[in-house]
A protein has these predicted regions:
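The feature primarily captures lumenal catalytic ectodomains
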Residues: 1-196
């Protein structure tokens, strides 16, 4: 059963109010965190790069993935029209813990290491303020879990299975945090943010 069906404009997550956690570098990159409240996920799929954030709090529809897919020469499928026919599912559960959006490329080892892992800079920064912060993930298309190399990497970084939750469209998340890419965010050609080498 659905509770809402309507067409809404899509906004980039960092076109709304954010908090800057690292100043802009010489290539125009900076690290920001966006906070979104009363969130449910919608979109073509729950798998990267398809999820959209719908905020019950302010009725915004938000694109959390701002990446250029170099092999395709474009961004996500939403970026042609920047609107979507929203179909919000009935809420079956509430997630009270703050969650950090981490639905990025975990299917390809190179992209996971180079593009996806740097998103964790924002996660670890925010975990200082929100010790119970969870990492919100989604498995690759056609899978029901993350690949072992992802879990192994999390373990090396001190992220346990208890720190990770899987995205569910029937869950309402009280607070979702979205962080900047250190290699994308509309700047796929310039060198990555220097923080990536820490």
């Amino acid at each position: 059963m659905n509770i809402r069906k309507t067409t809404l404009p899509i906004k980039y997550w960092n076109d709304l109010e954010t908090r800057i956690i690292s100043p802009e570098d010489e290539n125009g990159r900076k690290v920001e965190i966006g906070y979104f409240f009363g969130v449910q996920f919608t979109g073509h799929s729950i798998h990267y790069p398809q999820p959209l954030i719908y905020s019950h709090y302010d009725n915004n529809l938000i694109l959390p993935t701002k990446e250029m897919f170099m092999s395709l020469g474009r961004g996500t499928v939403y970026e042609d029209k920047m609107e979507y026919d929203v179909n919000i599912e009935k809420t079956e559960s509430i997630q009270d813990d703050f969650v950090y959006y981490f639905v990025y490329n975990t299917a390809n080892y190179f992209h996971f290491i180079y593009d996806t892992l740097p998103y964790l800079y924002g996660y670890f920064n925010e975990k200082k303020y929100f010790p119970n912060l969870k990492l919100l993930v989604s498995p690759p298309e056609g899978k029901n879990d993350l690949y072992p190399f992802v879990w192994d990497t999390f373990e090396l970084l001190g992220i346990t299975r208890d720190d990770v939750i899987f995205l569910d469209t029937k869950t309402r998340y009280n607070t979702v945090l979205v962080g900047s890419s250190l290699t994308h965010d509309g700047l796929s050609d310039p060198p990555p943010l220097s923080l990536i080498h820490i």
